[in-house]
Amino acid sequence: MAAGEPRSLLFFQKPVTFEDVAVNFTQEEWDCLDASQRVLYQDVMSETFKNLTSVARIFLHKPELITKLEQEEEQWRETRVLQASQAGPPFFCYTCGKCFSRRSYLYSHQFVHNPKLTNSCSQCGKLFRSPKSLSYHRRMHLGERPFCCTLCDKTYCDASGLSRHRRVHLGYRPHSCSVCGKSFRDQSELKRHQKIHQNQEPVDGNQECTLRIPGTQAEFQTPIARSQRSIQGLLDVNHAPVARSQEPIFRTEGPMAQNQASVLKNQAPVTRTQAPITGTLCQDARSNSHPVKPSRLNVFCCPHCSLTFSKKSYLSRHQKAHLTEPPNYCFHCSKSFSSFSRLVRHQQTHWKQKSYLCPICDLSFGEKEGLMDHWRGYKGKDLCQSSHHKCRVILGQWLGFSHDVPTMAGEEWKHGGDQSPPRIHTPRRRGLREKACKGDKTKEAVSILKHK
């Protein structure tokens, strides 16, 4: 303002309008702008209008430029997404260049470019479309689980988790499989189950499967049961290589061939009955009486014989039987075992390391089963050779048979009259107890474990 102007003219100056500060583009200039520049222009104009409204402290109508920009943005966004949907996935975001497999993912992503419509978490920085989703997310940081089940007292962060949990108590399974008819509680469980039926084709009863031994040209045919279903491609022998680099050598004679049948008996259980090994190849006696369930298919086939297994670990354990020298081999008695733990348990018999000691007598055993059989001997044979009566009484107390008095050293107790069998009192009873041992009645406070 000039110094000579009167002071009263300040109150009659025209207020600043939006058109005075707005930047306008012609149609040719607007067409030259890319998507990011258009978004930046819209944000600047919207922020300018907000600042002007806050300074004026009065309600101002939206200018034509702001209304036009908002309408054009919505129209541009719809046309871009429509073009992408007609062309098919991936759906492309023209703002940042990201691609999405579904249109819903693209819609959710477009809210990130508009800060006015996003709700960000102050702890992890994640963005959400609605404040409700943000409040559910904050419960995870705070540890709040307000939704509680009245039947089992389990708590959940949101109502959807509680509703899914209630299906367990109600037995509600709305999702059913169209192939086998099984029903599930969630859609995710159904999709996980449907993967079992994928690539499973029924095999005719007269169809044969050709198997080849790796490293050789030998091939043989093996029939496949009608109820068995095999996944195409898994019957190829390439998925089961031999555990050693050299070619397998089959046993036909010697001590190792005699122990081969015992090795196969200790292998993992299979769904088919195994026949004894004769010659160089194993034969499989299959039984068609019980159909195979689709969820328990034997898809891992042995390249040396016609056996099939449901797990790859069972197949690798079975292939050890075809090797010349099994890994779990005892050098003392030439016995072979399917696992290393059984070999260690067997070698204790040679090393005389009997770690299971009887607490009553001085006998020791190499296996736990032997000690348990020794403890149960009070009803059968007299396995405890040191003290018959002492061993029987203590074992009876341990096993809960203290009221049953066994025969001691061939002496028979007569029931009836004044003669009665001696009473055995456990040391857990308090006070002085009247003990009886071989007819001698004494009063003592010591335990029956020390009485002889």
From Swiss-Prot:
The keyword Transcription applies. Residues 16-88 form the KRAB domain. A zinc finger (C2H2-type) spans 91-113, 119-141, 147-169, 175-197, 300-322, 328-350, 356-378. Residues 433-444 have a biased composition (Basic and acidic residues). The record marks R185 as: Crucial for 5-methylcytosine recognition. Residues 410-452 are annotated as: Disordered. Keywords: Developmental protein, Diabetes mellitus, Disease variant, DNA-binding, Metal-binding, Nucleus, Repeat, Repressor, Transcription, Transcription regulation, Zinc, Zinc-finger. One of its GO terms (molecular function) is zinc ion binding. InterPro entries: KRAB, KRAB_dom_sf, Znf_C2H2_sf, Znf_C2H2_type. It is found in: Nucleus. The keyword RNA-binding does not apply. GO terms for cellular component: nucleus. One of its GO terms (biological process) is autosome genomic imprinting. Belongs to the krueppel C2H2-type zinc-finger protein family. ZFP57 subfamily. Transcription regulator required to maintain maternal and paternal gene imprinting, a process by which gene expression is restricted in a parent of origin-specific manner by epigenetic modification of genomic DNA and chromatin, including DNA methylation. Acts by controlling DNA methylation during the earliest multicellular stages of development at multiple imprinting control regions (ICRs). Acts together with ZNF445, but ZNF445 seems to be the major factor in human early embryonic imprinting maintenance. In contrast, in mice, ZFP57 plays the predominant role in imprinting maintenance. It is linked to Diabetes mellitus, transient neonatal, 1: An autosomal dominant form of diabetes mellitus defined by the onset of mild-to-severe hyperglycemia within the first month of life. In about half of the neonates, diabetes is transient and resolves at a median age of 3 months, whereas the rest have a permanent form of diabetes. The KRAB domain is required for function as transcriptional repressor. Zinc fingers 3 and 4 mediate recognition of the target element, ZF3 interacting with the 5' half (TGC) and ZF4 interacting with the 3' half (CGC). This is Zinc finger protein 57 homolog. The lineage of its organism: Eukaryota, Metazoa, Chordata, Craniata, Vertebrata. The gene is ZFP57.
